[in-house]
């Protein structure tokens, strides 16, 4: 691998950028990024992946091109958090998400899910997982974190997140704590707006920073930034990603972090809309971010590289700091390549372990006095199809629905797919149809945000029919339901979850999960 002393200015700058592309094969404009601008790192999404063999071939191709053009192996990165943020297709082994794992009550499960994920990714040639999420989901109205977090207390997030870090590293894959210094206590999605968390340093140390400190102590080699304003830390109205006070002053100097700092995508609206992606990339580099992501648009990555080159040549970007950052990247890549991975077992063992954890995550937030209602002879299964509730999720619908999958399992009753935000007319029609059924099984998907789902739930509950309500993403949908409604947290909208849920619905299995949310626990009592 090329040394720092052997690298040109353009090659150094290329080490500090990661870029993505559309489609299953890299287009010409993306290859131009590598060949002309020496971009040395890649991010993959579901849009780039058809199946395991195709992903393995793609990673090998990309690695070969980058090594030939830059003399340095690339980091090939991916967001494989588990649950609602998974980039591998359904045919591969996907783990439950963070909050589901925490609901099992066993931190060892977080370690095993990290080890399993690393084994899976490494087998395809992906060497850097952009996980775990170390945000504390202390705001129930948070539209982007939710079940991606391990819970709403710093202690739980620190414990489970640190175990995930250890599992990923033992499995031979680099990982990154995100989103520093915290994205949990906001009701704004930074993909779409510019959130603000108005806390002092001491307040952050008491809550938001605790999981990050624990993750760093567990050996996390990278930390991802967040595009959020922290006005008591950075008064210049710039988000953490672009703030030298936060990236260098707080993370490097006060917390003593010596690994690589990486950005969230600079095409998110918190940057693109308010500051501009190209300007934001340079500001992040100057703030102390080692690896900056332009994940969607190769043309923007070209502009960012051209702008960074001009800044390096005119003295705006400090060349000594550039060298320190690039050397840090080279050492990280050498360390990653030298990892000696452990394994959890063969594919069948990994799949079985993931399903064991998923089944253990299903949580009864409330059961009626008589226990789980019986489905009876003619159950009504209903709920909306999944939808992209945040840009962090995958870009396409799953192609299956909760009602239809449950009806298939039951082999009786009716499946009814509702709108994601049903209006009064649809609610009235659904309630009239429900009267003929023995039991109502309703699946919601962030109904606490799209309130029509909860209006439907309460209207159905008012019929007095036996009813089971299943939250298929954030469990806040389960608040304030009548006592006769059984309320279950399923955490995700996936076929493996539906398969694990069916024995609970038909009475042959008991939900054993424990709610990892103090706020919802209090509300449920």
Where are these regions (language model features)?
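A charged helix-plus-loop insertion that forms the helical arch/lid used to bind
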Residues: 92-105, 149-151
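Short, conserved phosphate-binding/catalytic loop or strand-edge motifs used
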Residues: 134-144
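Preference for extracellular/luminal or secreted protein segments
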Residues: 1-37, 275-525
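Alpha-helical scaffold segments that flank or form the walls of functional sites
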Residues: 104-126, 208, 217, 280-286
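Short acidic/polar active-site loop segments enriched in Thr and Asp
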Residues: 40, 127, 221-222, 290, ...
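Catalytic domains of carbohydrate-active enzymes, especially glycoside hydrolases
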Residues: 32-45, 115-128
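Second-shell residues forming the walls of enzyme active-site clefts
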Residues: 8, 20, 26, 47-70, ...
């Amino acid at each position: 691998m090329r040394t720092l002393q052997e690298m040109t200015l353009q090659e150094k700058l290329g080490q500090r950028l990661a870029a993505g592309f559309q489609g299953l094969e890299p287009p010409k404009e993306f290859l131009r990024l590598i060949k002309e601008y020496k971009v040395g790192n890649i991010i993959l999404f579901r849009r780039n992946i058809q199946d395991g063999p195709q992903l393995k071939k793609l990673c090998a191709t990309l690695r070969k091109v980058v090594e030939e053009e830059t003399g340095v192996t690339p980091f090939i990165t991916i967001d494989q958090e588990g649950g609602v943020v998974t980039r591998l297709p359904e045919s591969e082994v996907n783990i439950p998400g963070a909050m589901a794992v925490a609901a099992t009550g066993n931190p060892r499960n977080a370690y095993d899910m990290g080890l399993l994920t690393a084994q899976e990714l490494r087998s395809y040639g992906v060497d850097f997982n952009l996980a775990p999420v170390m945000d504390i989901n202390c705001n129930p109205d948070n539209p982007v974190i939710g079940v991606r977090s391990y819970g709403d207390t710093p202690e739980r997030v620190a414990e489970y997140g640190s175990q995930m870090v250890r599992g990923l590293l033992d499995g031979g894959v680099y990982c990154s704590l995100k989103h520093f210094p915290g994205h949990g206590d906001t009701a704004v999605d930074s993909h779409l707006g510019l959130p603000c968390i108005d806390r002092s340093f001491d307040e952050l140390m008491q809550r938001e920073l605790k999981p990050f400190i624990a993750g760093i102590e567990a050996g996390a080699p990278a930390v991802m930034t967040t595009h959020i304003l922290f006005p008591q830390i950075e008064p210049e109205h710039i988000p953490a990603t672009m703030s030298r006070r936060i990236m260098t002053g707080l993370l490097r100097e006060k917390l003593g972090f010596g690994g690589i700092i990486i950005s969230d995508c600079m095409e998110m609206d918190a940057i693109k809309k308010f500051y501009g992606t190209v300007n934001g990339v340079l500001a992040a580099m100057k703030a102390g971010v080692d690896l900056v992501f332009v994940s969607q648009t190769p043309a923007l990555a070209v502009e960012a590289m051209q702008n960074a080159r001009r800044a390096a040549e005119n003295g705006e970007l400090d060349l000594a700091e550039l060298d320190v950052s690039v050397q840090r990247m080279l050492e990280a890549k050498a360390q990653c390549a030298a990892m000696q991975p452990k394994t959890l077992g063969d594919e069948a063992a990994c799949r079985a372990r993931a399903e064991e954890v998923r089944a253990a995550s299903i949580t009864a937030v409330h059961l009626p006095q008589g226990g789980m209602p019986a489905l009876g002879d003619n159950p009504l299964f209903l709920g909306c199809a999944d939808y992209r509730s945040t840009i962090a999720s995958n870009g396409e619908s799953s192609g299956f629905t909760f009602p239809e999958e449950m009806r298939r399992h039951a082999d009786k009753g009716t499946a009814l797919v509702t709108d994601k935000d049903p209006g009064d007319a649809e609610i009235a029609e659904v309630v009239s149809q429900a009267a003929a059924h023995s039991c109502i099984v309703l699946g919601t998907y962030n109904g606490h945000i799209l309130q029509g789902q909860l209006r439907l739930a309460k209207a159905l509950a008012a019929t007095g029919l036996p009813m089971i309500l299943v939250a298929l993403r954030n469990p806040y949908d389960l608040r304030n339901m009548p006592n006769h409604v059984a309320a279950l947290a399923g955490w995700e909208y996936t076929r493996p979850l539906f398969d694990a849920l069916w024995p609970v619905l038909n009475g042959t299995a008991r939900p054993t999960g424990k709610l990892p949310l103090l706020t919802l626990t209090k509300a449920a009592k």
